[in-house]
């Protein structure tokens, strides 16, 4: 995958601003949404758009993607600030102390017997437009590595216990001598018998076969705050995969994906709505019920309103996640020109044009009564 494919999916350039990326995402997401687009391949396109936006809307992931491609955005390279997915600890490459300790058995090597936290997981949850505005509580179900229910995570057959590894004597590491041009180099490596645990399992658990873990379907309730947007994450501590050597469970990161609305668009706490009105309503003015996520609101359209005029409904937008308060709804007017007119409507518009002093390039054709008047020479 080249380093511009995600930009191509959204139809933006590589130097696009976050606002341009967000607008492009809303447009492409609505175009390919399975509930709207029934064409073959639309659902796959929709997923590709989601994947691209998840990366490009995050400044750190975007920087990694621009430099390394998709592998960098997914945490495949070091240098990120921890808390990534798949159990990476933020330091993708070790320091010099790790290099020297690997050759000389120095004290910089991590203790393989130490308790280690389990891997983090991620789960994408879809929210309706309204759920994102008002908040929701969702039950999510996913598979994770859990502590084995038969052996309680020991890996040993019930009634037996692990014993100290005879090869590493419980240290979890062994010394290996290597011949080099500089002489014999000694380095420490993880014990190949106990895999660093320091213990041997003579009789393995029949359920987990000695791993201490088993795949289970796990359910958890997620409280989603009002005002969330696509790409935001909710961290559930201890809901990831089981730890090692008695370590704690990892975390679950719930990634928000807000489905598009049929009538509204949103940017932050501001909601946008396009109001279609007739020429008569625009010219004479009217009072119209405007839909909002909070219910219909009566709004006055002043006489002489032009296409593109925007009105603001204060407090009818989305909640502000930071700082509190409520956003606004912007209502943009779109005057609809009729495409089919009957004779009476045409007569009325011609009369209006004459009264307004408008010169028609193609004057109206005379009607039946006009022809009768001409024949009788009646004014």
UniProtKB/Swiss-Prot annotation:
GO BP of this protein: chaperone cofactor-dependent protein refolding; DNA replication; protein refolding; response to heat
Residues the record lists as binding Zn(2+) 2: 165, 168, 191, 194
Entries under SUPFAM superfamilies matching the protein: Chaperone J-domain, DnaJ/Hsp40 cysteine-rich domain, HSP40/DnaJ peptide-binding domain
Binding site for Zn(2+) 1: 148, 151, 205, 208
Pfam family, one: DnaJ
Disulfide bonds: none
Annotated keywords: Chaperone, Cytoplasm, DNA replication, Metal-binding, Repeat, Stress response, Zinc, Zinc-finger
Domain commentary: The J domain is necessary and sufficient to stimulate DnaK ATPase activity. Zinc center 1 plays an important role in the autonomous, DnaK-independent chaperone activity of DnaJ. Zinc center 2 is essential for interaction with DnaK and for DnaJ activity.
Keyword Isomerase: no
GO cellular component: cytoplasm
Keyword Repeat: yes
Lineage, broadest ranks: Bacteria, Bacillati, Bacillota, Bacilli, Lactobacillales
PROSITE patterns: DNAJ_1, DNAJ_2, ZF_CR
Subunit structure: Homodimer.
Protein name: Chaperone protein DnaJ
Gene coding for it: dnaJ
């Amino acid at each position: 995958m080249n380093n511009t494919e995600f930009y191509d999916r959204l139809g933006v350039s590589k130097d696009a601003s976050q606002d341009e990326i967000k607008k492009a995402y809303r447009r492409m997401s609505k175009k390919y949404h399975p509930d709207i687009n029934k064409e073959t391949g639309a659902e796959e396109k929709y997923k590709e758009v989601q994947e691209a936006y998840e990366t490009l809307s995050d400044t750190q992931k975007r920087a990694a993607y621009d430099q390394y491609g998709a592998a960098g955005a997914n945490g495949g390279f070091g240098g990120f600030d921890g808390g990534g997915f798949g159990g990476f600890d933020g330091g993708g490459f070790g320091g010099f102390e790790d290099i020297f300790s690997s050759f000389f058995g120095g004290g910089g090597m991590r203790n393989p017997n130490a308790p280690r936290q389990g891997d983090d997981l991620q789960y994408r949850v879809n929210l309706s437009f309204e759920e994102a505005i008002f908040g929701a509580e969702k039950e999510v179900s996913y598979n994770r590595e859990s502590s084995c229910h038969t052996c309680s995570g020991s890996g040993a057959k019930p009634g037996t216990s692990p014993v100290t590894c005879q090869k590493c004597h419980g240290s979890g590491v062994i010394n290996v001598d290597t011949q080099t041009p500089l002489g014999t180099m000694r380095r420490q490596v993880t014990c190949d018998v106990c895999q660093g645990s320091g213990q041997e399992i003579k009789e393995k658990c029949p359920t987990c076969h000695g791993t201490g873990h088993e795949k289970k379907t796990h359910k958890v309730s997620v409280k989603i705050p009002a005002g969330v947007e696509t790409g935001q994450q909710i961290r559930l501590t201890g809901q990831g995969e089981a730890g090692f050597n008695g370590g704690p469970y990892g975390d679950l990161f719930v990634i928000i994906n807000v489905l598009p609305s049929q009538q509204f668009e949103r940017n932050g706490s501001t909601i946008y709505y396009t109001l279609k009105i007739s020429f008569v309503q625009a010219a004479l003015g009217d009072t119209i019920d405007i839909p909002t996520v909070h219910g219909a609101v009566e709004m006055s359209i002043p006489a002489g309103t032009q296409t593109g005029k925007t009105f603001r409904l204060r407090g009818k937008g989305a909640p502000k996640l930071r700082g509190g308060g409520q956003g606004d709804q912007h209502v943009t007017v779109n005057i609809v020109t009729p495409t089919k007119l009957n004779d009476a409507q045409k007569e009325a518009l011609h009369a209006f044009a004459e009264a307004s002093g408008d010169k028609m390039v193609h004057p109206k054709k005379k009607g039946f009564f006009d022809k009768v008047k001409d024949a009788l020479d009646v004014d």
